[in-house]
């Protein structure tokens, strides 16, 4: 399906932007799940890489469109349902160099998910499992630790730099916040 030349390329610093879902129809279309902040941004970053049988392959996006609640894609060389089914659940990866550089204080959502959230007093609030966009600011969805002293399962913290968010350390995957652990 892929030429040798395509397979030779591999992302230097791979970043997962989404995942391919189930096949759609008989002509090789696939559903796609995007984890970029604005779902359609995933199409701005090309080329895409996927890993099959431990090998990196570059895939070419031929076309994409909205279908009901989903976005569906057509990849070059994937022309029937069987070929599409082989790609179901493949992660869509790009090289970090393809992403725009961030300004100081901006973070990619994907970098924040998985971080431990600790208050300035040292209380562990749990782990970021998701991000939500609200009108005014982004919100961290923090899953509390199993034996949370306050019996809280999940906390929603506004991502307000300086006000709530005191420090983000991606190296240690820690976010320090000024937050009352009772909430």
Swiss-Prot record:
GO terms for cellular component: cytoplasm; ribosome. Its main location: cytoplasm. Residues 104-183 form the PRC barrel domain. One of its GO terms (biological process) is rRNA processing. Keywords: Chaperone, Cytoplasm, Ribosome biogenesis, rRNA processing. One of its GO terms (molecular function) is ribosome binding. The keyword Ligase does not apply. It is found in: Cytoplasm. It comes from the Bacteria. The keyword Ribonucleoprotein does not apply. InterPro entries: PRC_barrel-like_sf, PRC_RimM, RimM, RimM_N, RimM_N_sf, Transl_B-barrel_sf. NCBIfam families: 16S_RimM. The PRC barrel domain binds ribosomal protein uS19. Binds ribosomal protein uS19. An accessory protein needed during the final step in the assembly of 30S ribosomal subunit, possibly for assembly of the head region. Essential for efficient processing of 16S rRNA. May be needed both before and after RbfA during the maturation of 16S rRNA. It has affinity for free ribosomal 30S subunits but not for 70S ribosomes. Belongs to the RimM family. This is Ribosome maturation factor RimM. The lineage of its organism: Bacteria, Pseudomonadati, Pseudomonadota, Gammaproteobacteria, Enterobacterales.
């Amino acid at each position: 399906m892929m030429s040798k030349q395509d397979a030779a390329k591999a992302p230097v610093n791979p970043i997962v932007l989404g995942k391919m879902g189930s096949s759609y129809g008989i002509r090789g279309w696939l559903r796609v799940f995007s984890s970029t902040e604005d779902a359609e941004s995933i199409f701005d970053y090309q080329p895409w890489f996927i890993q099959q049988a431990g090998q990196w392959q570059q895939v070419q996006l031929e076309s994409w469109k909205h279908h009901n609640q989903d976005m569906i894609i057509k990849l070059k060389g994937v022309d029937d349902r069987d070929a599409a089914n082989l790609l179901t659940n493949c992660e869509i990866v790009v090289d970090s160099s393809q992403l725009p550089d961030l300004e100081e204080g901006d973070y990619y959502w994907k970098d924040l998910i998985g971080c431990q959230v600790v208050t300035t007093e040292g209380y562990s609030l749990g782990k970021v499992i998701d991000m939500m966009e609200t009108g005014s600011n982004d919100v961290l969805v923090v899953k509390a630790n199993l034996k949370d002293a306050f019996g809280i399962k999940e906390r929603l913290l506004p991502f307000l730099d300086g006000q709530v968010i005191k420090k983000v350390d991606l190296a240690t995957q820690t976010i320090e916040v000024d937050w009352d652990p009772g909430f």
